Amino acid sequence: MQMAHIGTDIIEIARIRKAIETHNQRMLNKIFTKKEQEYCLRLTNPYPSFAARFAGKEAVAKALGTGIGKVIGWKDIEILTSPKQPKVHLPPRVYKELGISKVLLSISHSREYATAMAVALV
């Protein structure tokens, strides 16, 4: 039987918008990969997508049981868009060190909030 660890997060889109407007490229480069930035910045309103990816990274880190910090950094968790569901890319060392076989992620947003739920399969 395969074990699963879950993580969830919710964030106000306005909070991410304010952080991006205040810190601009420095904040984007600290949190988001180049591919994530390219995807979000193509959109008319990028803030909900940035917030959903931020929540996704938090949810993944919680599911991994590490949080963001020493074991895994913001940009180690890359969330890319695919037709069926978001794809989570992690460094191979993370899978090996934590004994994770796969990470599944669901992200969503409303007008005010972005939310995410991650499942890490062991």
From Swiss-Prot:
It is found in: Cytoplasm. Mg(2+) binds at residues 9, 58. Its cofactor is Mg(2+). Its EC number is 2.7.8.7. The keyword Thylakoid does not apply. Transfers the 4'-phosphopantetheine moiety from coenzyme A to a Ser of acyl-carrier-protein. Belongs to the P-Pant transferase superfamily. AcpS family. This is Holo-[acyl-carrier-protein] synthase. It comes from Chlamydia felis (strain Fe/C-56). The lineage of its organism: Bacteria, Pseudomonadati, Chlamydiota, Chlamydiia, Chlamydiales.
